[in-house]
Amino acid sequence: METSGMTNASEKPSEKHAETHEGGCFCGSVRYAIEGAPTYMGNCHCRDCQRAIGASFVTWIGAKPENFVVTKGEIATCETSPGVHRGFCRRCGSSLTFTGDDWTDVAITAASLDDTSFVKPESNVYLDHRQPWVIIDEGLRCYDKLP
């Protein structure tokens, strides 16, 4: 198991952003802040996310790495497939982040945010793996794989 290379509070960017969102794990051992608007919001239905999160799908929001700041504790990570790292709280196991060698952003689990009222997914990906009981909002962009 590794610890994440995410920015720590002491390395917080000096530029103030108009928008800040905070969140953390279930037990409160890990806290984070996202400065600025998310780069994307979407639902992933892939089997890896289903198994890692323990749900039918996960809603991710993206942030530039320099705008994602761990303000308390440390996010532990494990490499779940080559070049893919999932971040979680070492104490309670809450899933928090997803990073990949081929990804420029940090993906954060939307459900770990303190306030989710601004979250509006734009797409569904990996619909070829969706669970049969999940009803899909056809108003969102829908893809069987990643676009």
Regions found by a protein language model. Give the residues of each.
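A short Gly-Trp-Pro
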Residues: E2-P147
